UniProtKB/Swiss-Prot annotation:
Annotated keywords: Ribonucleoprotein, Ribosomal protein, RNA-binding, rRNA-binding
InterPro entries in UniProt: Ribosomal_uL15 (IPR030878), Ribosomal_uL15/eL18 (IPR021131), Ribosomal_uL15/eL18_sf (IPR036227), Ribosomal_uL15_bac-type (IPR005749), Ribosomal_uL15_CS (IPR001196)
The organism of origin for this protein: Methylocella silvestris (strain DSM 15510 / CIP 108128 / LMG 27833 / NCIMB 13906 / BL2)
GO terms for MF: rRNA binding; structural constituent of ribosome
Protein name: Large ribosomal subunit protein uL15
Entry function: Binds to the 23S rRNA.
PANTHER family linked to this entry: 50S RIBOSOMAL PROTEIN L15, LARGE RIBOSOMAL SUBUNIT PROTEIN UL15M
Biased composition (Gly residues): 21-35
UniProt-listed Pfam families: Ribosomal_L27A
Chain spans, region Disordered: 1-35
Length: 164
């Protein structure tokens, strides 16, 4: 077999239908578009329609859900805290809180509190008052001689119920 002997498989390509060439052709007058309406006009494209093939937005599975009770923590690694201590942005003598981290520029918004994660090395002896911490972070903080206090979240205020 040579390159000049390659042929398409029989029936793999259909010849183009010439439309609008008289009613005897079977595709005259309205050219297979039916009568009037949006689909008979030019320039129309139905969003997401793939010619009858199952469209992409229906082929892909639905995933995940929104948890209305989920907490959104500011996560900070021990390595970033040590860099801030070395740069003098965190006072070693003071307790590290949500407010002090905002003041030092390590976090921008309060969100639902701060979670300390154990990536990196902490050499400074720091005491923390934060919402959450990983086990490795707690172990590293205590190994460096520091302390950590996990703050309890205040319960949500009850909404006014209709008593009528």
């Amino acid at each position: 077999m040579k390159l000049n002997e390659i042929q398409d498989n029989p029936g793999s390509s259909k010849s183009r239908m010439r439309v609008g060439r008289g009613i005897g052709s079977g595709k005259g007058k309205t050219c297979g578009r039916g009568v009037k309406g949006q689909k008979a006009r030019t320039g129309v494209a139905i969003k997401g329609f793939e010619g009858g093939q199952m469209p992409l937005h229906r082929r892909l599975p639905k995933r995940g859900f929104y948890n209305p009770f989920g907490l959104d923590y500011n996560e900070i690694n021990l390595g970033r805290l040590q860099e801030a201590v070395d740069a003098g942005r965190i006072d070693v003598a003071a307790v590290v809180t949500n407010e002090s981290l905002i003041a030092s520029g390590l976090i921008s918004k309060p969100r639902d509190g701060v979670k300390i994660l154990g990536v990196g090395e902490l050499k400074a002896k720091l005491s923390f008052q934060v919402a959450a911490a990983s086990k490795s972070a707690v172990a590293a903080i205590e190994a460096a001689g520091g302390s950590i206090e996990l703050l309890k979240r205040a319960p949500e205020a009850p909404t006014a119920s209709a008593e009528a």
